[in-house]
Amino acid sequence: MNNDPVVTPAGLIATVGGLGKIVKKAPGTAGSVAACVLAVFLPEPVRLAAIAALAALGVWAAGAYEKACGRSDPGEVIIDEVVGQLIATIGHAAVVGQGGGAVNFLIPSFLLFRFFDILKPWPVNACEKAPGGLGIMLDDVAGGVLANLALWGLRKVFIEGWWPF
């Protein structure tokens, strides 16, 4: 019998089909890249629904996986990065075939999300203190929100020429 928690439904969701286990170096970055690929092909309403569904499933799956493997916030759990990165793209990434902008905003959203996810400034670091799957997911949700807001600010200043002073 295989006792690997990856081969359970929770494990497959938490590790995004095992991707987090396959990619040994920087699995979180792999999760963010996977989310960027999804963002290019999913219209925004579908992305919003995916965020809600994956966040709810992610809390359950990440918590169950964490408990099964006996480690706190295991690195191979990357469903949180997928959700956080998708949040960072909302309002920015155009869908292929619906006008330009996909690459223009996906790359900065990716870089900003990875920045907030790795450095974990407040409130990101406070969110990861929540217990179990909630803490695993919540810090990346906060990182995604901060990345999204930062990208909006950068767009306003550098692209739209808006300056509040």
Annotate each PLM feature.
Residues M1-R71, G75, V82-F165:
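Hydrophobic alpha-helical transmembrane segments
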